[in-house]
């Protein structure tokens, strides 16, 4: 994210920001003709402290909940692979996923978002290394710039055997 814009005087002293959703490494090479790099969803910013270190937290603003249409909720156990395509059917390419993964004995837990075109994004959490990774090397047209198709990762402190994620998937970014 680049060039965040924040607002002052938001209700309840909130700090709300949007940002340009692109990367200077490939911003001029995206495979579009008129539409280039949207803004992010509005998100609330806050600070938190762990072991004396202060961190910035970013979460989608609660007003986004008003945009939800239909909600589906499921609990299930996975040993190996499970396909949940029916849960996101009919979403026209935009949906939100909130999930809590409770790990029983795996060193790595992961999932894949994919579509009927063969495009896919893999996400994994390495429980031992405490690293979350996202692999977008097969996410569609990735050949427009050598810096786009990549595996990225970040350190994440999660609960002992639990990982909570909130994913906003759209069809235009």
Predicted segments, located by residue:
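Conserved blade-ending motifs and adjacent loop-strand segments that build the rim/top face
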Residues: 1-2
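Beta-rich accessory regions
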Residues: 5-173
